[in-house]
């Protein structure tokens, strides 16, 4: 019957009988014949050539006669074909293909259809591949948000440890990037996460330098770095560790030299003709205001050098016990020398000079020594410091202001004659006087004169030295 020509051949009944006969004869499902590369039929005009079913309720494969190649295969480009192809590739490929990270910028337009979709079992991320319109290869669409998310999630699970940043060459000062992130690596145990980016200059993966993330410490070890690696604070920074108390290493020699310098300073000031015409109270006002600065200029002229050592500052408990012992032991009348010592501030109550304050003194001396100031220049600088019209309590302000202006004029003429060229020497000499503002008179008194004069005030010493013949 099958090999003969019947009049019913081509009818619906004939086709049904032949289909039922072929179903019983072929217990196995024929495989789909996917030969040659064909774009497939997407119009759906051709009728179905065959319909093959599998026994036991298995899937049915629908074949269509392609209008391009004339062969029977599933209709490519249709929704059914895409679903079947994707399902077949999902079970066939257990591993996600790695993205081809070549020198291609990738396809960011999204005009090409997806070439493949690969899923991983266990709920792992899905890598979507696109046919690049630049290089013609299949790789994730670079530059898109989806590519960034998938690449970051993939490398987060792959890399167990964060590599160190590789600032190669001179690219470390670049603060921007144009390409995709090269990797994001997380450490187990809640440790810090290092984000790597592909640099648009050197082509390597390193942290985005110059950003807030790069400035943050990448590990707890860097946050707890040794204090030796940190830059030292300047001597005028009171928040640094330079507030430790210090004392003279050789107090007897240094204090005697400082006392001799103070005596020469007062002798220089006292016998100035323009200073002698002032009343005693005005002389005392000027000297009490500038004796420390004048002494520093004298010590710089004498080239006095000294060294200091750290001393242990008394604790708060020792201060409380000393004060309470002094208060409870004052019931009986004390003799005059003991009373004077009792009224004077004890050694624990006095402010001990700190290392930063002593460093300010040494900086001023070094500045003066570097300029090689002559004797006349020292004298003019002393006159500028002595005749200060801004001293509070001064009555003859105009007279003192004229003396300071005249001293500056003489110093300017002297530097112009001794040093050819512009007034750089005059400016450098006056810049040394600016450093005197960082030096406290009480520090000089405690450092150089307290071991000798004891509890005597420096103001009383100035009055006594002005009234006596030196």
UniProtKB/Swiss-Prot annotation:
Transmembrane segments: none annotated. A motif (LXXLL motif 2) lies at residues 80-84. The keyword Glycoprotein does not apply. A motif (LXXLL motif 3) lies at residues 146-150. Keywords: Cytoplasm, Nucleus, Receptor, Repeat, Repressor, Transcription, Transcription regulation. A motif (AF-2 motif) lies at residues 461-466. Sequence repeats lie at residues 1-67, 68-133, 134-200, 201-253. Its main location: nucleus. A motif (LXXLL motif 1) lies at residues 13-17. Nuclear receptor that lacks a DNA-binding domain and acts as a corepressor that inhibits the transcriptional activity of other nuclear receptors through heterodimeric interactions. Component of a cascade required for the development of the hypothalamic-pituitary-adrenal-gonadal axis. May also have a role in the development of the embryo and in the maintenance of embryonic stem cell pluripotency. Homodimer. Interacts with NR5A1, NR5A2, NR0B2 and with COPS2. Interacts with ESRRB; represses ESRRB activity at the GATA6 promoter. Belongs to the nuclear hormone receptor family. NR0 subfamily. Homodimerization involved an interaction between amino and carboxy termini involving LXXLL motifs and steroid binding domain (AF-2 motif). Heterodimerizes with NR5A1 and NROB2 through its N-terminal LXXLL motifs. This is Nuclear receptor subfamily 0 group B member 1. It comes from Macaca mulatta (Rhesus macaque).
């Amino acid at each position: 019957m099958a090999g003969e020509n019947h009049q019913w051949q081509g009818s619906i009944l004939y086709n049904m009988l032949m289909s039922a006969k072929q179903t019983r004869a072929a217990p196995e499902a024929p495989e789909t014949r996917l030969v040659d590369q064909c774009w497939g039929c997407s119009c759906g005009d051709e009728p179905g050539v065959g319909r093959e079913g599998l026994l036991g309720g298995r899937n049915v494969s629908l074949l269509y006669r392609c209008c391009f190649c004339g062969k029977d295969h599933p209709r490519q480009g249709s929704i059914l074909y895409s679903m079947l192809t994707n399902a077949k590739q999902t079970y066939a490929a257990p591993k996600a293909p790695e993205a081809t990270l070549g020198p291609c910028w990738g396809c960011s337009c999204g005009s090409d259809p997806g070439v493949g979709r690969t899923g991983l079992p266990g709920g792992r991320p899905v890598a979507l591949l696109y046919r690049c319109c630049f290089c013609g290869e299949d790789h994730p669409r670079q530059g898109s948000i989806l590519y960034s998310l998938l690449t970051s999630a993939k490398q987060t699970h792959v890399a167990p440890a964060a590599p160190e940043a590789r600032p190669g060459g001179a690219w470390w000062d670049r603060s921007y990037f144009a390409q995709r992130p090269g990797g994001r690596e997380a450490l187990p145990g809640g440790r810090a996460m290092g984000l790597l980016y592909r640099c648009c200059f050197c082509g390597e993966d390193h942290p985005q330098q110059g950003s807030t993330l790069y400035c943050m410490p990448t590990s707890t070890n860097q946050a707890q770095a040794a204090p030796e690696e940190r830059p030292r604070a300047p001597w005028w920074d009171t928040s640094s560790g330079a507030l430790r108390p210090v004392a003279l290493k050789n107090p007897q020699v240094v204090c005697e030299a400082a006392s001799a310098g103070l005596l020469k300073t007062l002798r220089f000031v006292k016998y100035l003709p323009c200073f002698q015409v002032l009343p005693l109270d005005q002389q005392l006002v000027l000297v009490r205001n500038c004796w420390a600065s004048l002494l520093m200029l004298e010590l710089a002229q004498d080239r006095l050098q000294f060294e200091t050592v750290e001393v242990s500052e008394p604790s708060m408990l020792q201060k409380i016990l000393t004060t309470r012992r002094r208060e409870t032991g004052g019931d009986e009348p004390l003799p005059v020398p003991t009373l004077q010592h009792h009224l004077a501030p004890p050694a624990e109550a006095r402010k001990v000079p700190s290392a930063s304050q002593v460093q300010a003194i040494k900086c001023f001396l070094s500045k003066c020594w570097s300029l090689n100031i002559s004797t006349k220049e020292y004298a003019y600088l002393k006159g500028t410091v002595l005749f200060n019209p801004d001293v509070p309590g001064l009555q003859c302000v105009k007279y003192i202001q004229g003396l300071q202006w005249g001293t500056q004029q003489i110093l300017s003429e002297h530097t112009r004659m001794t040093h050819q060229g512009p007034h750089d020497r005059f400016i450098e000499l006056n810049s040394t006087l600016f450093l005197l503002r960082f030096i406290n008179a009480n520090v000089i008194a405690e450092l150089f004169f307290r071991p000798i004069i004891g509890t005597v005030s420096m103001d009383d010493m100035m009055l006594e030295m002005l009234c006596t013949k030196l």
